[in-house]
Amino acid sequence: TQDILAAAEFSRERFWSKANASDVDTWKKTTRRYRKYLHDQVIGRLPAPRVAPRPRSRLIYRKKKYTGYEIVLDVYHDVFAYGILLVPKGIRKGQKRPVVVCQYGLEGRPQDLADTAIDHPAYHRYVAHLAEMGYVVFARQNPYIGQDQFRRLQRLANPLGLSLFSFIVRQHQRILQWLATLPYIESNRIAFYGLSYGSKTAMRVPALLEDYCLSICSADYNEWIWKNASARHSYSYLLTGEYEMFEFDLGNSFNYAEMSWLICPRPFMVERGHHDGVAPD
């Protein structure tokens, strides 16, 4: 395994040899095959949803500068998308605002980001602060919660050629479609911000769904293949209990750099801290 790991960067170089970066239009055309490959062969593509979204909302926050709602959208008959939508007050009729879709880390809830009564040491209510600044914000629930419960879902999906992100991608697609229908939303300015495990979403989902206008990966961007498979690297997932990380032949096709190439030419940003524990400083 370690010998294959050392050769992976050269396999990726051969794999990407048909991408042409001579200009933006050529790049877009020649990387479509890689976006399709990532979705079909690495993440695993679920059929497009056929059910109506049937949006349901419930008022949960009344703040001085914004109002908050719990939102539920149907994706499949037994799969739904859930999150908290914060809408700034004072939006004039006909005015449209940009949106930030936000994602927390492992074992989190949207309330960890949006509830002003919770001051999580990693998040510090940043979703509420964005709403106070005038952004529409959607903090969504991801299925990586429940310790081994969600990891069992991953292992059940893998023999079918699927992964947890197969469902996450379709949930995001449904959320983007619904957000674009809201009269106060500027649908071509929906951005994504993910932190920690949420940044695994920031790498994969905007690479596949071009409706996101930009992506920010916070506290996760890495030499991802080594981090997953190295037997010697002190930050390797081989030394943790997060055994669900591995993806289909990822090392020979996509590292985090290559995923970010699929976001290009849309803006992409990396945030990291000197002491965030992601990689050696």
Can you name each region flagged by the protein language model?
Residues Y184-S196:
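Alpha/beta-hydrolase fold nucleophile elbow
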Residues A7-V87:
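Non-catalytic accessory segments flanking enzyme active sites
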Residues R92-T181, W226-A231:
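Cap/lid segment of the alpha/beta-hydrolase catalytic domain
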Residues F167, L214-M259, H274-D281:
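Mobile cap/lid helix-loop segments that gate and shape the active-site cleft of serine hydrolases
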Residues Y76-H77, Y104-R109, S196:
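Active-site glycine-rich loops that stabilize anionic/oxyanionic intermediates
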Residues G194-P206:
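Glycine-rich nucleophile elbow surrounding the catalytic serine of serine-hydrolase chemistry
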Residues A207-C213:
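Conserved hydrolase catalytic core segment
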Residues I263, V270-R272:
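Short beta-strand/loop motif that positions the catalytic acidic residue
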